[in-house]
Amino acid sequence: MLAMSIGLPTHPAKCYAASGPSWIAENILNNTGFVGRISRDLVLRELPLRDAVKFWGAAASRRSAAELLDVLSVTGGVPRYLEEVRPSLPALENIRRMCFLPEGTLFKDFKRIFADVFGPRAALKARILRAIADGPLNGAEIAKAIGIGRGGTISDELDELELAGFVAKDAGLNPETATRTRTSQYRLSDNYTRFYLQYVEPRATEIEGRKYKFAALESLPRWSTVLGYQFENLVLANFDRLQELLGLKGTEILSAAPWRKKAADGKSGCQIDLLVQTARTVWVVEVKRRARIGEEAVDEVRTKLARIRFKGRKSIRTALVYCGELAPVVRGSGFFDFLVPAEELFR
């Protein structure tokens, strides 16, 4: 029946596999001509860090977490991209080869996958991704940024981008009301896409003419900010491992998502990188990637806590997931209940 309904030749001994999430949803799952039960609805996610690091083979044990994360900040945990990594080369050379040469896999792949997956609607979806490349936005903010009306169109486009793995919809519990957040935030969750839109696409002509010389990640505009977003994506994508490190394995999680409180009525807002809520406890998780992480990390989280009016009498715990040199004052302050170095996410 499936083969007949979508125009494929039928054969009793053959099984057909279709790819492209939006095509499958539109032409099979939501097609009235499809009759039958779905055996399995499987969405392939990127590899967890403990598996992604295996692409470095024996060299992984000799590489710093920072160097591994430099590459993963560009590739994410996508196996096809990790196959292009040469473990013997430094991170910067791997990135140069993959992104900043005309024959590089990551230089060519964005337009190809977008055209294959989304067809004629690829241009609109790319505009949406550009709008959230600088940080998460809600649906109304995205519609305004790209100049289209709010409503079904933007919702449908975001749903397809989420299904395809480009976007994550963050909609946890509001800690001030203990109810589901009414306005979801849409985050660009695919590290390759953000890196491409921020740094490769604007230089495409120079790269094609072999005139662009990539020297260092630090020389890229706003790299420290983008690096923070990329590291946050990797931490959020590896929440299962983080649960273990925070002693939450086996605990029922009511909500786990970034949370943003807007400024209103003259009061300042705040952004929590990851807010984990259980029946009795709220975990405020800060994610930092800097060369040196000092007392400002403590001050920032303390300020955020002061701006949130937690509902009920729950315990509050704090955690810092970090990559960089941790100043002794941070550990000595005792402010963070858990300090999680990036190395632990790979284990």
Model-predicted regions and their roles:
Residues 1-216:
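Phosphate-binding site recognition
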Residues 178, 184-347:
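A cross-kingdom feature that marks ATP-driven nucleic-acid transaction machinery
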